[in-house]
């Protein structure tokens, strides 16, 4: 009998369940201006977080960090399925999209709120997930700028690369 034929299978871990939900929630989504499946980003963020901690709640939050902001999944559903701590970390990574205004008009406001929140936070879990998320984003931008150059910036709500540089420097300072 091989491992696939075993009668009793262990219950999926918290992290396994987070991967399943994130994959379902992000199904069919792609990274901005790319053919890369979106799930690659939260999986990379979780892999980065795993270099800093083996805490299953932090790793679950890392893989789930965009589901509330970008999909149909609600924070209450995260809380019910994964508990308060995971939900609180995911909430800390979720921007208020301000659906009543164009995203380009609220970019600076949203990013400043993120920087302010990270500056005030004393929760190491929040900082680990934020760092993992931002590092994954920076890596993707680096790969893409090597491929398409400054055309990269056209895909974002904020078209000015200097503003992106400000944001990631400010996040870095907030995480110190």
Regions found by a protein language model. Name each.
Residues 2-176:
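Active-site helical microenvironments for divalent-metal-assisted chemistry
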């Amino acid at each position: 009998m091989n491992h696939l034929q075993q009668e009793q299978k262990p219950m999926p871990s918290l992290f396994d369940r987070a991967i399943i939900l994130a994959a379902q929630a992000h199904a069919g989504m792609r990274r901005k201006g790319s053919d890369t499946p979106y799930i690659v980003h939260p999986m990379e963020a979780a892999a980065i977080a795993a270099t800093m901690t083996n805490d299953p709640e932090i790793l679950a939050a890392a893989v789930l960090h965009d589901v509330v902001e970008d999909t149909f999944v609600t924070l209450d559903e995260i809380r019910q399925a994964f508990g308060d701590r995971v939900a609180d970390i995911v909430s800390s990574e979720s921007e208020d999209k301000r659906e009543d205004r164009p995203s380009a008009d609220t970019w600076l406001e949203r990013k400043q709120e993120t920087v302010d929140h990270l500056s005030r936070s004393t929760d190491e879990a929040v900082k680990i997930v934020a760092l993992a998320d931002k590092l994954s984003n920076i890596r993707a931008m680096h790969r893409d700028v090597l491929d398409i150059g400054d055309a990269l910036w056209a895909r974002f709500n904020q078209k000015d690369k200097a503003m992106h540089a400000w944001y990631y420097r400010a996040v870095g300072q907030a995480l110190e």
